[in-house]
Regions:
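Residue-level detector of family-conserved "landmark" positions at structurally sensitive sites
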Residues: 13, 113, 130-131
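Short secondary-structure transition/capping segments
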Residues: 22-26, 123-124, 141
Length: 164
């Protein structure tokens, strides 16, 4: 409330900013966008892979100068795991999650999640605004528990056979 009085608006569970000044860097993570990072110990998420560059400066320089390996880790993230990350990270934002976006991106049904959201809405923990499920201020305070409920429900879902 104090921040709102001074023109700061909440855009993420632990972040407030004046209009036009949200942290674009962190929004990449919260919205699941791809990102590339460079230099020793840099982490990236690009083309379905998550990878980290070697933290040791000598190994990094040797790899760059001699066209050798510079990655210390590289993994392909399974689609269901990405769907879980979408739920967890998007629910941290005031924009929340959207059914069509979720279903199209991850080929998982939204209906089981919708049932959970509707129950939570009756407790004033979330609300549907223009087709997007968002946590309320009360919901933000209980976000970890809410996200666990949704992830448990998501794990039970069977993948769709085709895109909607």
């Amino acid at each position: 409330e104090t921040l709102e009085q001074f023109g700061y608006h909440q855009y993420e569970i632990s972040n407030f900013a004046k209009d036009g000044y949200i942290c674009r860097h962190n929004m990449k993570y919260w919205t699941g966008d791809e990102y590339l990072s460079f230099g020793p110990c840099a982490a990236s998420d690009f083309a379905g892979k998550r990878f980290t560059i070697a933290p040791d400066i000598e190994k990094y320089m040797d790899g760059v100068l001699n066209k050798g390996a510079i990655l210390s880790e590289c993994e392909t993230v399974p689609m269901r795991e990405r769907a879980g990350e979408y739920l967890m990270l998007r629910l941290r934002t005031v924009d929340g999650v959207e059914e069509g976006e979720y279903t199209k991106s991850f080929l998982l049904p939204f209906e089981p999640l919708e049932e959970v959201f509707q129950k939570l809405a009756k407790q004033d923990l979330c609300k549907n605004v223009s087709g997007r499920w968002r946590l309320t201020p009360k919901g933000f305070m209980l976000s970890n528990s809410i996200i666990v409920l949704l992830l448990e429900q998501q794990q039970k879902s069977k993948p769709l056979t085709q895109k909607k």
